[in-house]
Amino acid sequence: MYTKSVELHKEALEHIVGGVNSPSRSYKAVGGGSPVAMEKANGAYFWDVDGNQYIDYLAAYGPIITGHAHPHITEAIKTAAENGVLYGTPTKHEVTFAKMLKEAIPSLDKVRFVNSGTEAVMTTIRVARAYTGRTKIIKFAGCYHGHSDLVLVAAGSGPSTLGTPDSAGVPKSIANEVITVPFNDIESYKAALDKWGSEIAAVLVEPIVGNFGIVEPEEGFLEQVNELTHKAGALVIYDEVITAFRFMYGGAQDLLQVKPDLTALGKIIGGGLPIGAYGGKKEIMEQVAPLGPAYQAGTMAGNPASILSGIACLEVLKEEGVYERLDELGARLEQGILAHAETHGITITVNRLKGALTVYFTDEKIVNYEQAENTDGEAFAKFFKLMLERGINLAPSKYEAWFITTAHTEEDIDATLQAVEDAFRHMKK
């Protein structure tokens, strides 16, 4: 079934570190083996190098909300290719796109384009430090903010201790600038501010978590974080790399009616091409060069290909009924998964928000990383492989979301549920 994928992975191991260009693409978290190599994609479907077809819920870890090879986005990319994909000069298209982002996300007074979500987050931290004159940041356990040194930090031994490096090559001195606290735990957040408040430049928040599954903030949590942070003289940064344009046209901040000082964007806003952006209050953003002392630059930043692709993607998402449709399909999928789990005696919890969900193998409602970490990884690994064999492509990690796209249909959801039912039946044997 996967002969060519296995052969390709063996060859890749000779030339590419670990055989993959991002560790999340390996199957290490689901028991190992050769990852399936895809050859083409269209709409909600993948075809691998062996010719097997899959219904895709990976969606490239979130960006492909309109489905693969969407005609409107494809035409935009063709236009860019025909007119030059990289200028190194200003263009009218980047102004158009900046205006679209500002109209969609009201907290953005000014915007700057970069090349990835990692870059966007990294720069918001630099800007916050420049604006406040402070150096420390607070982040929440389990929330992934890219692979820059400052955010590759794990929790220390207590809720208000300094962090420890979460990767080789991250100096302890950098980790000492980060305090990690549990998500949805306002008392731990207060304790961190009581201890370090005068040194905190910013708190970095996923307003809706996407990196240990889909986890919503408890009622009042984000509002209290905003209030306490500002009282301490620090800034609030929202990492909306996953959430922006995922749950509604705009950001999670608009859905939840909370506003940060700075926002990092990525994934969906590129329409499938590499991009990042950050923005926020005018007086804070004017810290950025050439207006201010906080330096940030990029050869590829604002390139016409990514910008035109992003504009086209947002034009599709702005169409009436898009998010209602994603919510309907998400509800159909969630209800079916839960029904089949009950029928076959499989213990799961599903966290869903509109067109994104996570299936946890536990009976506990997941509200923080510690709970997600304690879910049954072996059960998920078995489920993942059974689903793959049945033509359903999921992320190879118990922490990741299933992403529904505008290309998915009721028939796709029903075919997926048939695979779920069969997988659960086999898991009970």
Swiss-Prot record:
Which reaction(s) are listed as its catalytic activity?
Answer: (S)-4-amino-5-oxopentanoate = 5-aminolevulinate
Q: Which InterPro entries match?
A: 4pyrrol_synth_GluAld_NH2Trfase, Aminotrans_3, Aminotrans_3_PPA_site, PyrdxlP-dep_Trfase, PyrdxlP-dep_Trfase_major, PyrdxlP-dep_Trfase_small
The protein's location, in the record's own words, is: Cytoplasm
Give the pathway annotation.
Answer: Porphyrin-containing compound metabolism; protoporphyrin-IX biosynthesis; 5-aminolevulinate from L-glutamyl-tRNA(Glu): step 2/2
Q: What class of enzyme is it?
A: isomerase
GO biological process annotations for this chain's record? Answer: protoporphyrinogen IX biosynthetic process
Instruction: Tell me the keywords, alphabetical order.
Output: Cytoplasm, Isomerase, Porphyrin biosynthesis, Pyridoxal phosphate
Q: What is its EC number?
A: 5.4.3.8
Q: What cofactors are annotated for this protein?
A: pyridoxal 5'-phosphate
Which GO CC annotations does the UniProt entry carry?
A: cytoplasm
Q: Which GO MF terms does the UniProt record name?
A: glutamate-1-semialdehyde 2,1-aminomutase activity; pyridoxal phosphate binding; transaminase activity
Q: Does the keyword Nucleotide-binding belong to this entry?
A: no
Which residues are recorded as modified (N6-(pyridoxal phosphate)lysine)? Answer: K267
Which protein family is it in?
Belongs to the class-III pyridoxal-phosphate-dependent aminotransferase family. HemL subfamily.
Complex formation: Homodimer.
Protein's recorded name? Glutamate-1-semialdehyde 2,1-aminomutase 1
Please tell me the species this chain comes from. Bacillus velezensis (strain DSM 23117 / BGSC 10A6 / LMG 26770 / FZB42) (Bacillus amyloliquefaciens subsp. plantarum)
